[in-house]
């Protein structure tokens, strides 16, 4: 777990920085595809702003500190306020994010299977979304302000043609149908394909960061 998690933005881009003992140890930057300094992170005002914050100095850029991070394992959902949310190692699973940016309350579910569970198991799409939604409202989120983003649903059995094996597609359909039924606006999604994903959510601006196992990073 990082000592500090920072979100820094300017007119051109934005980045999440994970730190340890006031040192930048990892970053996710929206400019990574076009950045001339991605190997050395030199001459970057976004990096400079993060370093200045860690040294207690003021910056002209927008710098926000998050209150920790939460990671949902398979069949789990996690809820927090002003925290970085993560689901890692998604194949056919779906990472579902619900958030109320006005309060900073957000949740993330690691959905394993489509449909609902009679016993309330959060590994099922409908059950996870319903329970997470209600728990967020109890925590103080505003029902009419909650929005959704989700990613995952890869076709891990790419050589199989049987529909029953297309669990990624079925998961994505189940997630979307549940959100529509709940009247939760879907702001972004990234589903399908044959590649695994890690998903990170930043509650400050509502960004979903999708990192493919092949290295590509999307900010949605």
UniProtKB/Swiss-Prot annotation:
Catalyzed reactions per annotation: L-glutaminyl-[protein] + H2O = L-glutamyl-[protein] + NH4(+)
EC number of this enzyme: 3.5.1.44
Catalytic class of the enzyme: hydrolase
Record keywords, A-Z: Chemotaxis, Hydrolase
Gene Ontology terms, MF aspect: protein-glutamine glutaminase activity
A GO BP annotation: chemotaxis
A Pfam family matched in the record: CheD
Function of the molecule: Probably deamidates glutamine residues to glutamate on methyl-accepting chemotaxis receptors (MCPs), playing an important role in chemotaxis.
Family: Belongs to the CheD family.
Protein name: Probable chemoreceptor glutamine deamidase CheD 2
Organism: Methanosarcina acetivorans (strain ATCC 35395 / DSM 2834 / JCM 12185 / C2A)
């Amino acid at each position: 777990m990082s000592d500090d998690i920072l979100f820094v933005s300017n007119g051109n881009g934005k980045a999440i920085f994970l730190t340890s003992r006031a040192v930048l140890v990892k970053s996710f930057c929206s400019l990574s595809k076009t950045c001339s300094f991605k190997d050395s992170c030199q001459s970057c005002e976004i990096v400079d702003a993060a370093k200045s914050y860690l040294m207690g100095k003021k910056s002209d850029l927008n710098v926000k500190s998050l209150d920790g991070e939460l990671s949902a394992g398979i069949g789990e959902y996690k809820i927090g306020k002003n925290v970085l949310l993560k689901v890692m190692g998604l194949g056919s699973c779906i990472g579902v994010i619900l958030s109320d940016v006005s309060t900073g309350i957000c949740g993330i579910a690691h959905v394993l299977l489509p449909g609902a569970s009679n016993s309330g198991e959060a590994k099922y799409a409908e059950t996870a979304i319903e329970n997470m939604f209600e728990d967020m409202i109890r925590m103080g989120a505003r029902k009419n302000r909650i929005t959704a983003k989700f990613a995952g649903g890869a076709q891990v059995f790419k050589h199989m043609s049987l529909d029953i094996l297309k669990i990624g597609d079925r998961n994505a359909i189940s997630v979307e149908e549940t959100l529509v039924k709940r009247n939760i606006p879907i702001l972004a999604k990234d589903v399908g394909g044959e590649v695994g994903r890690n998903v990170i959510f930043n509650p400050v601006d509502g960004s979903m960061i999708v990192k493919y196992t092949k290295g590509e990073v999307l900010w949605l």
